[in-house]
């Protein structure tokens, strides 16, 4: 048994190590050089939506199903309450969150983390960048970098062959079965191909085609995303794979565009005012806890002219305990002693910005400010409103940070089943082809936070187990 894995992030490395542990010959094909490999995983803190090492968070299933797709045909939805074996081809290939797959995701999450623990990783409930939270998050000690380095060494110890600086170009097929891979350094034949090579956040043409022309204002959240150019998705679609996930969307994160750090996130906007290039507010900065709502706020930033906004706070930001943990940029705030002076430094229309701030301050009311919980301290008579933590911003000095939407990963990918087998447009598994991580599509509308790394580990492992005949 020869298993070919494309990509070396958490999905690819989980697949490669699992396959090698079953006794398979394994080849990993990776575009990046050694030491630069690992895709997005290398740069992420790798939050995991778990309430313990063995159980997913209480809201795991509910959040996925609340963002399960578009307006699905009720007849197809009714099919999905039956046993998966009784689904029609239409139901099997439908673009939506597959409840059977979601059940497998939740069921295998704990055992996958225990397997990663056996491989040498350690996990704990460590502090996050979120000042206010709704759900629980487990983290690997050392973040995604520890995952990449630990699993790479484990793979090498098991005899896995790595072909770095090698790009996958196309799938090889015979008699409707995938038999190998065409690469930039020649063909590789095998019994199964596992596509774990990310989404298309590093491909401007695909972003413009699917997300839209304004995607020129998006950039990958970290260096690893630039390597994810969508070939894995494209080559599978070319042989009839069914698409899944929202191709027109992506996981949005608010970052400081001046910074070259990985994930230079700005999560402190609930305590200030967001304005666009016209010097106007455009969204509720604080609809709820920041971990649950930052993505929707960031999407509103992306919709503004040139996809940029500025967060403005005043000296009372220091009333928020440890607010700096929500500001991951290495760039200093822009400071001024008046709103007029700040407008000049930000190159914003001073009259408009002064009017915006005056209207906002006038709409703030007296009340208890509780920065570590939803306090209901809301503006009155202001459109758009601010639902929590609304205090006047009128105490110099004033501080500002630019914010854009980063593209953490794209939502569109391939339809897979609970074993990570790629499904074709007729609802059948394509023999010899699997997908995991970003290359598989499961997200619609709003991202179910802290599940992408977990998705990669779970379905990378499930793909390898099935390909090796060891299905759990």
Language-model-detected regions and their locations in the chain:
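N-terminal Rossmann-like FAD-binding beta1-loop-alpha1 element of flavoenzymes
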Residues: 3-27
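A glycine-rich dinucleotide-binding beta-alpha-beta segment and adjacent secondary-structure elements
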Residues: 170, 352-443, 447
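Helical element adjacent to the flavin cofactor pocket in flavoenzyme catalytic cores
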Residues: 139-191
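Short, well-ordered coil/turn residues at beta-beta hairpins
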Residues: 7, 190, 196-197, 277, ...
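Glycine-rich loop(s) and the adjacent beta-strand/alpha-helix scaffold that form part
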Residues: 188-255, 453, 462, 466
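An anion/pyrophosphate-binding glycine-rich loop and adjacent beta-alpha core
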Residues: 225, 233-352
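N-terminal leader/propeptide and maturation segments of large enzyme subunits in energy/redox metabolism
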Residues: 75-84, 88-105, 312-314, 321-370
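Conserved N-terminal/central alpha/beta ligand/cofactor-binding core
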Residues: 31-161, 274, 281, 287
């Amino acid at each position: 048994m020869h298993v070919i894995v494309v990509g070396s992030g958490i999905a690819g490395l989980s697949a490669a190590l699992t396959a090698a542990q079953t006794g398979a010959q394994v080849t990993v094909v990776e575009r990046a050089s050694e030491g630069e490999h690992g895709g997005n995983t290398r740069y992420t803190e790798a939050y995991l939506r778990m309430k313990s090492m063995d159980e997913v968070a209480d809201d795991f299933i509910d959040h996925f199903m609340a963002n399960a797709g578009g307006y699905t045909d009720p007849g197809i939805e009714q099919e999905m309450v039956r046993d998966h074996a009784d689904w029609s081809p239409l139901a099997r290939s439908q673009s939506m969150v597959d409840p059977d797959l979601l059940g497998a995701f939740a069921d295998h999450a704990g055992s996958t983390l225990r397997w990663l623990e056996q491989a040498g990783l350690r996990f704990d409930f460590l502090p996050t960048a979120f000042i206010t939270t709704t759900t629980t998050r487990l983290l690997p000690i050392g973040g995604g970098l520890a995952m990449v380095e630990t699993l790479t060494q484990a793979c090498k110890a098991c005899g896995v062959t790595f072909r770095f600086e090698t790009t996958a170009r196309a799938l090889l097929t015979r008699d409707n079965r995938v038999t190998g891979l065409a690469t930039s350094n020649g063909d590789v034949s095998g019994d199964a191909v596992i596509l774990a090579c990310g989404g298309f956040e590093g491909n401007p043409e695909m972003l413009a085609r699917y997300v839209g022309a304004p995607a020129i204002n998006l950039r990958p959240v970290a260096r690893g995303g630039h390597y994810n150019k969508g070939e894995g998705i494209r080559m599978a679609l070319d042989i009839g794979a069914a698409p899944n996930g929202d191709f027109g969307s992506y996981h949005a994160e608010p970052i400081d565009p001046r910074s070259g750090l990985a994930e230079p996130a700005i999560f402190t906007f609930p305590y200030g005012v967001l304005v666009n290039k016209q010097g106007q507010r455009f969204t509720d900065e604080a609809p709820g806890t920041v971990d649950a709502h930052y993505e929707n706020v960031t999407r509103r930033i992306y919709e503004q002219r040139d996809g940029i906004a500025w967060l403005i706070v005043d000296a009372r930001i220091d009333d928020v305990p440890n607010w700096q943990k929500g500001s991951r940029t290495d760039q200093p705030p822009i400071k001024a002693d008046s709103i007029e002076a700040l407008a000049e430094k930000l190159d914003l229309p001073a009259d408009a910005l002064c009017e915006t701030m005056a209207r906002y301050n006038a709409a703030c009311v007296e009340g208890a400010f509780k920065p570590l919980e939803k306090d209901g301290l809301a503006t009155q008579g202001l459109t758009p409103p601010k639902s929590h933590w609304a205090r006047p911003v009128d105490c110099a000095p004033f501080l500002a940070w630019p914010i854009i939407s980063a593209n953490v990963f794209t939502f569109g990918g391939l339809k897979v089943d609970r074993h990570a087998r790629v499904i074709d447009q007729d609802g059948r598994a394509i023999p010899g082809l699997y997908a995991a991580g970003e290359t598989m599509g499961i997200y619609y509308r709003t991202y179910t936070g802290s599940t992408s790394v977990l998705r990669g580990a779970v379905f990378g492992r499930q793909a390898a187990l099935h390909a090796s005949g060891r299905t759990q």
